[in-house]
From Swiss-Prot:
Organism, scientific name: Aliivibrio fischeri (strain ATCC 700601 / ES114)
Family, as annotated: Belongs to the gamma-glutamyl phosphate reductase family.
Entry EC number(s): 1.2.1.41
Known pathway: Amino-acid biosynthesis; L-proline biosynthesis; L-glutamate 5-semialdehyde from L-glutamate: step 2/2
Pfam families, per database record: Aldedh
Disulfide bonds: none
Compartments where located: Cytoplasm
Gene Ontology biological process: L-proline biosynthetic process
The protein's name in its UniProt record: Gamma-glutamyl phosphate reductase
Keywords recorded for this protein, A-Z: Amino-acid biosynthesis, Cytoplasm, NADP, Oxidoreductase, Proline biosynthesis
Molecular-function annotations in GO: glutamate-5-semialdehyde dehydrogenase activity; NADP binding
InterPro entries attached to this UniProt entry: Ald_DH/histidinol_DH, Ald_DH_C, Ald_DH_N, Aldehyde_DH_dom, G-glutamylP_reductase_CS, Glu-5-SA_DH, GPR_dom
Superkingdom of the organism of origin: Bacteria
């Protein structure tokens, strides 16, 4: 496999995509959706190979479920592509404009970024999500999925490329790195002549490697410790429902709750509710004050927090628990422990809510709502290519607009600078 050749082909395809009309891009998306359903037998057969390999490798059942494609899930993925068709195409839209004193009409117009390299985890639906969003925004993409979904991804990319050609667009608009070789990832990160942006979707190790080795701008997405703070004024029964949803609805999601902070004034009452609610379902990892309150309850899976626990993105049925003095201590804890993804305060006090909003450094901050809402579809953005936890270019769920840049357009009547 020659990555340089892939890069050259992607750059050439990006020029064609940048001027492709919305109707043509939507036609390609419609064909992709239809081809996914028409080729379901081949796709599911490829997925069976991945699942068999996962079982033989001893991969957890939770991870196997993330790898699994079913006919129902495939229909859902096809419909997600159709939903992208219905989203407004941001390319070519005017962000703002003004007329200068010299008579020039000056505006900013949205344009594609160019070629986007995406390195992502073992979820085959991500292949379709990324390809669809990049296509809609006129970006070419080079994808590198996890080895656990190799066969599934190869079949999915084949379907995408057939659809692109049927729509009159270059097949190289979406390419896939076939070998799960880390050396190829390292090479991709240095291909700044061809690739304009890198998006890693995975754990802290992948993000660190990309930041340290890439000569291409990197969007850091997904990783971050998510917190909930239960304030002394909170409605405890309703707060418990939000905490449960944040933690247990889908614990493997990047927006699932990792650490629960509880105001000391309500800690005895709330932790009693928490213990009964989480018993038999969630392991609680508690600092001394919280541990002392929780150990009184039977049936609770409980251990004392060790160094590094509050810096851990659990992605499982595990929850860190800490008692704090007030919203200020909660904010200080969050600043120390990588609160960059999604954080929520449960409170009936407006001042506490505003202080939390202003001090939280996360990409998404909530008042009396679950952390699980940090998602492109939930935000009304359609699908997402990633959830950015950095501060430059894009922040939070990255939908269509976040996959564009802009150019300045000046129009005048043969104007010269004096």
């Amino acid at each position: 496999m020659n990555l340089t050749t892939m890069g050259q082909a992607a750059k050439a395809a990006a020029f064609d995509l940048a001027v492709a009309p919305t109707a043509q891009k939507n036609k390609a998306l419609a064909i992709i959706a239809d081809e996914l359903e028409a080729n379901k037998d081949a796709i599911l057969a490829a997925n069976e190979k991945d699942i068999k390999a996962a079982v033989e490798a001893g991969i957890s059942e939770a991870m196997q479920d993330r790898l699994l494609l079913t006919e129902e899930r495939l229909v859902g993925i096809a419909n997600d592509v159709r939903n992208v068709i219905n989203l407004n195409d941001p390319v070519g839209s005017e962000i703002d404009s003004k007329v200068l004193e010299n008579g020039m009409s000056l505006s900013r117009r949205r344009v594609p970024i160019g070629v986007i390299g995406v390195i992502y985890e073992a979820r085959p639906n991500v292949t379709i999500d990324i390809a669809s969003l990049c296509l809609k925004t006129g970006n070419a993409s080079i994808l590198r999925g996890g080895k656990e979904t190799f066969f599934s991804n190869m079949e999915l990319v084949k379907v995408i490329q057939v659809a692109l050609e049927k729509a009159g667009l270059p097949a190289a608009s979406v390419q896939y790195i076939e070998k799960p070789d880390r050396e190829l990832v390292s090479q991709l990160l240095t291909m700044d002549d061809y690739v304009d942006m890198i998006i890693p979707r995975g754990g802290a190790g992948l993000h660190k490697m990309c930041k340290e080795n890439s000569s291409i701008p990197v969007i850091i997405g997904g990783f971050g410790i998510s917190h909930a703070f239960v304030d002394e004024s909170a409605d405890l029964e309703r707060a418990l429902v939000v905490v449960d949803n944040s933690k247990a609805q889908r614990p493997s999601a990047c927006n699932a709750l990792d650490t629960l902070l509880v105001h000391e004034a309500v800690a005895p009452q709330f932790l009693a509710l928490l213990a009964n609610n989480m018993a038999g379902r969630v392991e609680l990892v508690a600092e001394p004050k919280a541990y002392g309150l929780l150990k009184e309850f039977e049936g609770v899976s409980l251990r004392e927090a060790q160094e590094g626990d509050f810096d851990t993105e659990w992605l499982s049925y595990t929850l860190g628990v800490k008692v704090v003095a007030d919203v200020n201590e909660a904010a200080a804890h969050m600043q120390k422990h990588n609160a960059s993804h999604s954080d929520t305060i449960l409170t009936n006090n407006i001042e506490s809510a505003e202080k939390f909003i202003n001090t939280a450094g996360s990409a998404a901050v909530y008042v009396n709502a679950s952390t699980r809402f940090t998602d492109g579809a939930q935000f009304g953005l359609g699908a997402e290519v990633a959830v950015s936890t950095q501060k430059l270019h894009a922040r939070g769920p990255m939908g269509l607009e976040e996959l564009t840049s802009y150019k300045w357009v000046g129009k005048a009547d043969y104007l010269i600078r004096s």
